């Protein structure tokens, strides 16, 4: 999630509960998801993956005899009575498994992953999940510099104010599994992003000193049916970094705003939206293709986004704004011209590529913004939504049960994950009759 307002979006799912460090007795059952690895020569081959909810979503309770209460709240270190030190946290906080992910708004069906923001009983799980490898003990590490990532999406139930996010985070492959974090990736530990949030546990360990959790973040997709946004966020540190004080702030070690790619921000208002008048019609499912284009030395130079719908390739839009280079890709010249100062200072596109080369974890979520109504994504210069239209109270009037479905996650060589369906040429009809 690419904005500080993500914090407000998450509080509804936390309900005062955060991840414990000692697994409990309730079984964890991960939904299975079929994904694909692609080459131009061999096509796309299926692979087995699993989905795990973020550790913050798992049920938590204090160990027996420690009284009622949780093990901490978002934005703060854990309470000292149960977490005076890391070792005590590991003993005193019990994290239970989740036997039925559907109760948290997460279901899979073959190649499809469905995330529900609101359940029929009114609960708001706002799930965030990660992609596990076939062992279920490690995250699937994506190395995408010089490659492309593609998925199909149904965004029809995402009105103004909603955000379906699919992005990459430079988390540890095991979720930083350790003596005091025995669950690791199996329980969804180790989250970080470029916002450097403070959470009671970082890498599964009690965050006694209240540090922030920072790492490189590549927002492949943050969107609803009215607006879309792509943004690389770089940090000048490798992997998960524990920040303190000013390091966690805007001028710190990570680029919080990113270099954003949104058609509305460059005066292209007919490219993406609900209806046939838009090139990408979000009233129907479509395919999202993101290419991470490298030079001959293997350094990331450009990020190229385009779509496929109804069998036709919809090429990326070109910028249409004075002072902005005429381009249809994210590249350093564009980022510098749009005021992405921190992005340029902290490593720019090459720095993002270095993280993509080291390997990043795929995260997927759905959320709303109780504080800012997601207006950074879809209002004003960013999109067509009216002021206040994205308030949660209005979202449920437009769509009582917001959800998103991601299907056919696939990645591989440039040009290997998508195809344009060529319509057959009409056969010549019979010649004129000569009666």
UniProtKB/Swiss-Prot annotation:
<dbReference type="GO" id="GO:0005576">
    <property type="term" value="C:extracellular region"/>
</dbReference>
<keyword id="KW-0732">Signal</keyword>
<feature type="disulfide bond">
    <location>
        <begin position="259"/>
        <end position="335"/>
    </location>
</feature>
<keyword id="KW-0325">Glycoprotein</keyword>
<keyword id="KW-0326">Glycosidase</keyword>
<dbReference type="InterPro" id="IPR037019">
    <property type="entry name" value="Glyco_hydro_7_sf"/>
</dbReference>
<keyword id="KW-1015">Disulfide bond</keyword>
<feature type="glycosylation site" description="N-linked (GlcNAc...) asparagine">
    <location>
        <position position="109"/>
    </location>
</feature>
<protein>
    <recommendedName>
        <fullName>Endoglucanase EG-1</fullName>
        <ecNumber>3.2.1.4</ecNumber>
    </recommendedName>
</protein>
<keyword id="KW-0119">Carbohydrate metabolism</keyword>
<keyword id="KW-0378">Hydrolase</keyword>
<dbReference type="InterPro" id="IPR013320">
    <property type="entry name" value="ConA-like_dom_sf"/>
</dbReference>
<dbReference type="GO" id="GO:0008810">
    <property type="term" value="F:cellulase activity"/>
</dbReference>
<dbReference type="InterPro" id="IPR001722">
    <property type="entry name" value="Glyco_hydro_7"/>
</dbReference>
<keyword id="KW-0964">Secreted</keyword>
<comment type="function">
    <text>The biological conversion of cellulose to glucose generally requires three types of hydrolytic enzymes: (1) Endoglucanases which cut internal beta-1,4-glucosidic bonds; (2) Exocellobiohydrolases that cut the disaccharide cellobiose from the non-reducing end of the cellulose polymer chain; (3) Beta-1,4-glucosidases which hydrolyze the cellobiose and other short cello-oligosaccharides to glucose.</text>
</comment>
<feature type="disulfide bond">
    <location>
        <begin position="38"/>
        <end position="44"/>
    </location>
</feature>
<feature type="disulfide bond">
    <location>
        <begin position="83"/>
        <end position="89"/>
    </location>
</feature>
<keyword id="KW-0136">Cellulose degradation</keyword>
<keyword id="KW-0873">Pyrrolidone carboxylic acid</keyword>
<feature type="glycosylation site" description="N-linked (GlcNAc...) asparagine">
    <location>
        <position position="267"/>
    </location>
</feature>
<dbReference type="GO" id="GO:0030245">
    <property type="term" value="P:cellulose catabolic process"/>
</dbReference>
<feature type="disulfide bond">
    <location>
        <begin position="160"/>
        <end position="385"/>
    </location>
</feature>
<feature type="signal peptide">
    <location>
        <begin position="1"/>
        <end position="20"/>
    </location>
</feature>
<feature type="disulfide bond">
    <location>
        <begin position="235"/>
        <end position="254"/>
    </location>
</feature>
<feature type="disulfide bond">
    <location>
        <begin position="71"/>
        <end position="93"/>
    </location>
</feature>
<comment type="similarity">
    <text>Belongs to the glycosyl hydrolase 7 (cellulase C) family.</text>
</comment>
<feature type="active site" description="Nucleophile">
    <location>
        <position position="217"/>
    </location>
</feature>
<feature type="disulfide bond">
    <location>
        <begin position="196"/>
        <end position="214"/>
    </location>
</feature>
<feature type="disulfide bond">
    <location>
        <begin position="243"/>
        <end position="248"/>
    </location>
</feature>
<keyword id="KW-0624">Polysaccharide degradation</keyword>
<feature type="modified residue" description="Pyrrolidone carboxylic acid">
    <location>
        <position position="21"/>
    </location>
</feature>
<feature type="disulfide bond">
    <location>
        <begin position="192"/>
        <end position="215"/>
    </location>
</feature>
<feature type="active site" description="Proton donor">
    <location>
        <position position="222"/>
    </location>
</feature>
<dbReference type="Pfam" id="PF00840">
    <property type="entry name" value="Glyco_hydro_7"/>
</dbReference>
């Amino acid at each position: 999630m690419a904005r500080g307002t993500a914090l407000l979006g998450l509080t509804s799912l936390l309900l005062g509960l955060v991840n414990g460090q000692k697994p409990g007795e309730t079984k964890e059952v991960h939904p299975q998801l079929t994904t694909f690895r692609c080459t131009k020569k061999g096509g796309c081959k299926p692979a087995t993956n699993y989905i795990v909810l973020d550790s913050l979503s798992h049920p938590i309770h204090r160990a027996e005899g420690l009284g009622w209460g949780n093990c901490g709240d978002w934005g703060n270190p854990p309470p000292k009575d149960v977490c005076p030190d890391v070792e005590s946290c590991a003993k005193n906080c019990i994290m239970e498994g989740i036997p039925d992910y559907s109760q948290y708004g997460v279901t899979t069906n073959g190649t499809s992953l469905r995330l529900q923001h609101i359940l029929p009983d009114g609960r708001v799980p706002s799930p965030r999940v990660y992609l596990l490898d076939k062992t279920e003990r490690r995250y699937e590490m994506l190395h995408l510099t010089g490659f492309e990532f593609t998925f199909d999406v149904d965004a029809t139930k995402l009105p103004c104010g909603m955000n379906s996010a699919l992005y990459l985070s430079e988390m540890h492959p095991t979720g930083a599994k350790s003596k005091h974090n025995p669950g690791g990736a199996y329980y969804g530990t180790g989250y970080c992003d470029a916002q450097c949030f403070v959470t009671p546990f970082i890498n599964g360990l009690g965050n006694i000193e209240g540090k922030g959790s920072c790492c490189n973040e590549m927002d492949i997709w943050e969107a609803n049916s009215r607006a879309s946004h792509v943004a690389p966020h770089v940090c000048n540190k490798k992997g998960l970094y524990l920040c303190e004080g000013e390091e966690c702030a805007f001028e710190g070690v990570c680029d919080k705003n990113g270099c954003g790619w949104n058609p509305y921000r460059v005066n292209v208002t007919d490219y993406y939206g609900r209806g046939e008048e838009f090139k990408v019609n979000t009233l129907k499912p479509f395919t999202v293709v993101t290419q991470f284009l490298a030079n001959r030395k293997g350094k990331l130079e450009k990020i190229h986004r385009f779509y496929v719908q109804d069998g036709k390739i919809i090429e990326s839009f070109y910028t249409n704004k004075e002072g902005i280079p005429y381009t249809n890709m994210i590249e350093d010249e564009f980022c510098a011209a749009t005021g992405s100062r921190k992005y340029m200072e902290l490593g720019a596109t090459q720095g993002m590529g270095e993280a993509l080369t080291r390997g990043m974890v795929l995260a997927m979520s759905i959320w709303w913004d109780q504080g800012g109504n997601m207006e950074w994504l879809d209002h004003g210069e960013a999109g067509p939504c009216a002021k206040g239209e994205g308030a949660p109270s209005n979202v449920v009037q437009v769509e009582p049960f917001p959800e998103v479905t991601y299907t056919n996650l696939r990645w591989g060589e440039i040009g290997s994950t998508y195809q344009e369906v060529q319509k057959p040429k009409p056969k010549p009809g019979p010649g004129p009759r000569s009666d």
